Structure formats: structure tokens, C-alpha cells
């Protein structure tokens, strides 16, 4: 539908309108032209490292990701140390009830966040998606803050994950120095990223398959153990049930304990939004993204909520092995490993430790991918040095990738006596950072819908709509704010058994992400000095993807006669 047919007018550029024409043009559904040489396209020869030259209207990044890649990134991409290891510390602080409820609340939030992101990513599949949406639909300065916050988040996560990899290996061999393992895994991450988006996609596909299969195996075994089907020489040889929900209790340390689990839940879900970032490098986002977005429901429900429910049934929250203070670093504190150990299942603890190792390595690869693409998008908008706009012939943003990888060397600091201090500060930077990204996605979706209506469009012109609509985004934004408030409360009043909060240093270790985001926003505003975007000045046309409306309308016609309950299932699951 043309602009004249739809009856809307693109807002004129004024003082508070950002020009996106330079970086986001209408994208053809078949994607950009690609180099004829297969080795060049996949970064396998010297020529692939040369700068790529673009014709008018071409996008900057290659789009090699297929539907299977997006589906597995959505369903298993962010399952890592926060879920497998950090959940142990959360259980120790808040008890099984808080663990279950807090992850459920964050899961509801993420359900709405990912659907809102999916709607925007299908409409505007651009590099650095959520940063671009914040700058485009909310405020350029806020977009600057969200972009650099996201880059910093992943820059902090990479050395964290490398450190966890080294410590995880020590479960089997403590004689070889951790530095050797950090070097090995950093090398693996570099090699995978040399293959660009396709390397990331393939690694995530197979790593996610492994993580999800392992989690399913764990839940089947856990179900048997809860019913008392464990080995005779183990703990769970009699009916176990929900005894730990009664003694020592479902909710530990009261309201403080309940609030303290939120930060672990947020850290565990970090990376879920990468499926939106990957849309810019997907062969056909319109066709592939909806199915990938719908996978998030199953991951939240089955793998996070149900998996941690079994953890709460089988592991005592007072177990001394749950090292709250080192819960993100030491796989020995993983409740998944402890279940196998206490059950007397020979080799199961080693299997779960291997799963943890694969998971944290996967998150490290994701960190380089997500951070580098966002940094490139920032540079394209003039919010980062021009050097980072460089894209080679295989679609790799090489300077941005190198920039992120350099942060991996911080992991070697963990070998020093001051290592734990550095680890705490890295965790402080990354722990809550994702909440600001998720809240911004919801707010950008709300603002987009408002501007879409203002400029004369209807909801029928949106090919994929968020399941909860704009109300789901309001709910997601509300939960983000509540979680940030809850974490502020625990930062000034820590639950019993947690490191004390009596100094400014202790407070900022709990809440550093907030002043960091505020600082980025101030810098962005001082740099561009552009006011908050008003609805009439939000441009909803530039960069809008072309759609095959015959195919979309045919699908809608097929679904329309179905009963209401079947239509809900189709749109949601």
C-alpha cells in the first residue's frame, strides 16, 4: 500500500525528528545481493576481510540465518550460567517459593517484551534493532543510552562467562591453571565469530539443542526422584514430594528474600532479546520471526518455570553448597549438579557440568554477536566512532567484533587476588542492564502503536501483532519498573545471609546499572540536544519492510473461520 493510498503523511523533519533515511531504507523481502564467491560470503578467504561496498538501498549486514536458527536462538539462546548456576544462590536467598514466583513474573514480562520486539523487528528489521527503536520512537538521547548500555552489558558479560568456563573445568581438573582454559575458550569464541552471523547461528542452534535436551533429561529424572524412584544409595529413594516447601519453607527471608531473587531471574533471561537483533540477518524475517517468537512461551514455561520448580523440590534452600556469594561463578553451587550428586546417579553431575560449560560458552559467543551489532548500529547513527561502521564482504562488523573480544582479556584479572572484586563489579554492570533494554522495548512498542494510529494506519496493516497488544507492553513495562524498585530496596536493605549493605560501594554493586544508564542518557542529550519525540513527529514509514500481502491475507482468511480458542492458540503458541 502506498503512502497516498493509506492516507497518511510522513512527518516533516523538524528540530526533534531524527533522520533515519541514511541507515534504514525499505528492505526487499528477498534480502541484499550477496558475493558470488561462497568462501568470501562465509569469511573463509583473505578477500572476505575487505570492505564491502553498497549500492543504493542495500542493507549493511548479510542475512544468512534461516528459520531453524531463529527458532533455536529464541527457545534456548539465553539459557546459561544464570539459570544453571545462579539459580542456586537465588534459592538460598529466597527459598523455592520465591524462586518459582519471581521467575514466573519475569517470564510473563519477557513474554510481552519478546512479542513487542517481534512486531517491531518484522516491520523494521534493522541492525541494532532495540537501540534503533528506542531512538526512533522514544528519544534519540535515550536510544543512545540504550545502545551503549547494551554494548557495555555484553562487554561485561564476556569476561564473566570466560571466568565461569575456567572455574567449571576445575570441577574435573584443578591442576591446570585457569588462565589456560580462559585462553582456550576465548580462542573458540574468536574462531566462531570469524564465521560471522552464520557461525553464531550454527553455534547457537547446536548449543541450544544440547541445552534443551539436557534440561528435558533433567526434568524427567527429577520427576522420578520426586516420586521416590532414585537409587537406594542416594537421597531420593523414597517419596520426596514437596517437603522442602514446608521445612525450611517456601519463602525464605521474607519480602527481602523475595525481592533479592529478581536480579538473578533478570540475569538468567538476559539474551532473550537477541532473536530481535538476529532479525536483521535473517533471510526472511516476515516468515521466520513469528514462529521463533512463539517458541519463547515454551522456553519460559517448560524450561525455566518447570525446571526450577523441580529444583525447589529437590534441593534444600539451607544447603551449605549453595554459595550465594559465588553463585554465578562456581558450578559446584549449581542445584542441577547437586541433584545428580545427592541422588547417587553416577556421572550425572559430570553431565550437568558439561551442559553448564557449553551454556556459558554459548552466552560468551552471543555477547560478542549482540554487542558488536549494536555498536555498529550506534556508529551508523554517529553515536560511536566511524571506525565501527566497517563491514567486510562476508557481513562481519570486524572492528566492533574486535572491540568486544578485547574485553574478554579482563577475565585474566580473576586470577589475581583482586579478581573477586573485579568479578563483583562486572556482575553489577550486567545484572540489571537488561531490564532497561526490555522496558525500552515495551515503551518503544507503545509509542510506535500510538504514532501508527496517528498517521492514519490500522492494525490490519501490521503483519504480525504482539499477542498482548499494547496492553501487554504496558504490563511488561510495569513489571520492569517494579523489579527495579525491588532491587533498589534490596540494595539498601539486604536479606539475611547476603553481603552487608552499609557503604556506597555495597549499594552500587547492587544497583550500578541505573546510574550508568542515567549517565549515558545525559551524555546523549548533551551531544545531540534533541527533545523528546512527540507523536506527530515520529516517522513510521522510513525503513518499513515490503510485505507479500497476498500471502498474509490468505493466511488471515484461513484462520478467520476458526473458533476463538483456536485463533488464540495460533496467535500465541
Swiss-Prot record:
Matches recorded under InterPro entries: AA-permease/SLC12A_dom (IPR004841), Amino_acid_permease_CS (IPR004840), APC_YAT (IPR050524)
Induction description: During mycoparasitism.
Transmembrane segments: 72-92, 99-117, 176-200, 212-229, 257-280, 296-315, 351-371, 398-415, 425-444, 470-494, 511-527
Keyword Oxidoreductase: no
PROSITE patterns xrefs: AMINO_ACID_PERMEASE_1 (PS00218)
Pfam families per the UniProt record, alphabetical: AA_permease (PF00324)
Subcellular location as annotated: Membrane
Main location: membrane
Homology family: Belongs to the amino acid-polyamine-organocation (APC) superfamily.
Protein name: Amino-acid permease inda1
Top-level taxonomy: Eukaryota, Fungi, Dikarya, Ascomycota, Pezizomycotina
Originating gene: inda1
Amino acid at each position: 500500500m502506498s503512502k497516498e493510498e493509506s492516507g497518511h503523511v510522513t512527518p516533516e523533519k523538524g528540530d526533534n525528528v531524527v533522520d533515519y533515511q541514511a541507515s534504514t531504507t525499505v528492505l526487499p523481502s528477498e534480502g541484499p545481493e550477496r558475493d558470488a564467491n561462497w568462501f568470501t560470503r562465509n569469511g573463509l578467504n583473505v578477500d572476505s576481510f575487505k570492505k564491502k561496498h553498497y549500492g543504493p538501498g542495500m542493507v549493511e549486514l548479510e542475512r544468512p540465518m534461516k528459520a531453524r536458527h531463529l527458532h533455536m536462538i529464541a527457545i534456548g539462546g539465553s539459557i546459561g550460567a544464570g539459570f544453571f548456576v545462579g539459580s542456586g544462590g537465588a534459592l538460598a536467598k529466597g527459598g523455592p517459593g520465591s524462586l518459582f514466583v519471581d521467575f514466573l513474573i519475569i517470564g510473563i514480562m519477557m513474554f510481552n517484551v519478546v512479542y513487542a520486539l517481534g512486531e517491531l523487528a518484522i516491520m523494521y528489521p534493522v541492525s541494532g534493532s532495540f537501540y534503533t527503536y528506542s531512538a526512533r520512537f522514544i528519544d534519540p538521547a535515550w536510544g543512545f543510552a540504550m545502545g551503549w548500555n547494551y554494548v557495555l552489558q555484553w562487554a561485561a558479560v564476556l569476561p564473566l562467562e570466560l571466568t565461569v568456563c575456567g572455574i567449571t573445568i576445575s570441577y574435573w581438573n584443578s591442576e591446570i591453571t585457569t588462565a589456560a582454559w580462559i585462553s582456550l575458550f576465548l580462542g573458540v569464541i574468536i574462531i566462531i565469530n570469524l564465521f560471522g552471523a552464520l557461525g553464531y547461528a550454527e553455534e547457537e542452534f547446536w548449543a541450544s539443542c544440547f541445552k534443551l535436551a539436557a534440561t528435558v533429561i533433567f526434568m524427567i529424572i527429577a520427576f522420578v526422584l520426586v516420586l521416590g524412584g532414585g537409587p537406594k544409595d542416594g537421597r531420593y529413594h523414597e517419596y520426596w514430594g514437596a517437603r522442602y516447601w514446608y521445612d525450611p519453607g517456601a519463602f525464605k527471608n521474607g519480602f527481602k528474600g523475595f525481592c533479592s531473587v529478581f536480579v538473578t531471574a533478570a540475569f538468567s533471561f538476559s539474551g532473550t532479546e537477541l532473536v530481535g537483533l538476529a532479525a536483521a540477518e535473517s533471510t526472511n524475517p516476515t516468515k521466520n520471526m513469528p514462529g521463533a517468537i512463539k517458541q519463547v512461551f515454551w522456553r519460559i514455561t517448560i524450561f525455566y518455570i518447570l525446571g526450577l520448580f523441580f529444583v525447589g523440590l529437590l534441593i534444600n534452600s539451607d544447603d551449605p553448597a549453595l554459595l550465594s556469594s559465588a553463585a554465578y561463578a562456581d558450578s559446584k553451587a549449581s542445584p542441577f549438579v547437586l541433584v545428580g550428586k545427592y541422588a547417587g546417579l553416577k556421572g550425572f553431575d559430570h553431565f550437568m557440568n558439561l551442559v553448564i560449560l557449553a551454556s556459558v560458552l554459548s552466552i560468551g559467543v552471543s555477547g560478542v554477536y549482540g554487542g558488536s551489532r549494536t555498536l555498529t548500529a550506534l556508529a551508523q547513527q554517529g553515536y560511536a566512532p566511524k571506525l565501527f561502521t566497517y563491514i567486510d564482504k562476508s557481513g562481519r562488523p570486524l572492528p566492533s567484533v574486535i572491540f568486544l573480544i578485547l574485553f574478554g582479556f579482563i577475565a585474566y584479572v580473576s586470577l589475581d587476588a583482586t579478581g573477586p572484586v573485579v568479578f563483583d563489579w562486572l556482575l553489577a554492570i550486567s545484572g540489571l542492564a537488561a531490564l532497561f533494554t526490555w522496558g525500552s522495548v515495551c515503551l518503544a512498542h507503545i509509542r510506535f502503536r500510538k504514532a501508527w494510529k496517528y498517521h492514519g494506519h490500522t492494525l490490519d496493516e501490521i503483519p504480525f501483532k504482539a499477542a498482548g497488544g499494547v496492553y501487554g507492553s504496558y504490563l511488561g513495562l510495569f513489571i520492569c519498573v517494579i523489579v527495579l524498585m525491588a532491587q533498589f530496596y534490596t540494595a539498601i536493605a539486604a536479606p539475611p545471609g547476603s553481603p552487608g549493605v552499609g557503604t556506597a560501594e555495597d549499594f552500587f554493586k547492587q544497583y550500578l546499572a541505573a546510574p550508568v544508564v542515567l549517565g549515558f542518557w545525559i551524555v546523549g542529550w548533551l551531544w545531540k540536544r534533541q527533545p523528546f519525540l512527540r507523536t506527530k513527529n515520529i516517522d513510521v514509514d522510513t525503513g518499513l519492510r515490503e510485505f507479500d500481502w497476498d500471502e498474509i491475507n490468505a493466511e488471515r482468511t484461513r484462520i478467520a473461520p476458526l473458533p476463538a480458542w483456536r485463533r488464540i492458540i495460533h496467535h500465541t503458541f
